[in-house]
């Protein structure tokens, strides 16, 4: 009986450790994806900055 308890605890412990490692990796990939999205949004904002009043891309003579 003692052998079964030890084996069961060992299996549960190893499963818990592997689960926590997977969750940590998942969290890291989500953070990287969020950082990429933030960079893309900031690049879009830079492209579409408001034009100052009175500005025209055409030459005025």
Swiss-Prot record:
<keyword id="KW-1213">G-protein coupled receptor impairing toxin</keyword>
<keyword id="KW-0840">Vasodilator</keyword>
<dbReference type="GO" id="GO:0090729">
    <property type="term" value="F:toxin activity"/>
</dbReference>
<keyword id="KW-0379">Hydroxylation</keyword>
<keyword id="KW-0838">Vasoactive</keyword>
<dbReference type="Pfam" id="PF03032">
    <property type="entry name" value="FSAP_sig_propep"/>
</dbReference>
<keyword id="KW-0800">Toxin</keyword>
<dbReference type="GO" id="GO:0006952">
    <property type="term" value="P:defense response"/>
</dbReference>
<feature type="modified residue" description="4-hydroxyproline">
    <location>
        <position position="52"/>
    </location>
</feature>
<feature type="compositionally biased region" description="Acidic residues">
    <location>
        <begin position="30"/>
        <end position="42"/>
    </location>
</feature>
<keyword id="KW-0964">Secreted</keyword>
<dbReference type="GO" id="GO:0005576">
    <property type="term" value="C:extracellular region"/>
</dbReference>
<feature type="propeptide">
    <location>
        <begin position="23"/>
        <end position="50"/>
    </location>
</feature>
<dbReference type="InterPro" id="IPR004275">
    <property type="entry name" value="Frog_antimicrobial_propeptide"/>
</dbReference>
<keyword id="KW-0878">Amphibian defense peptide</keyword>
<dbReference type="GO" id="GO:0042311">
    <property type="term" value="P:vasodilation"/>
</dbReference>
<feature type="signal peptide">
    <location>
        <begin position="1"/>
        <end position="22"/>
    </location>
</feature>
<keyword id="KW-0732">Signal</keyword>
<comment type="function">
    <text>May produce in vitro relaxation of rat arterial smooth muscle and constriction of intestinal smooth muscle. May target bradykinin receptors (BDKRB).</text>
</comment>
<protein>
    <recommendedName>
        <fullName>Probradykinin-2</fullName>
    </recommendedName>
</protein>
<feature type="region of interest" description="Disordered">
    <location>
        <begin position="24"/>
        <end position="61"/>
    </location>
</feature>
<comment type="similarity">
    <text>Belongs to the frog skin active peptide (FSAP) family. Bradykinin-related peptide subfamily.</text>
</comment>
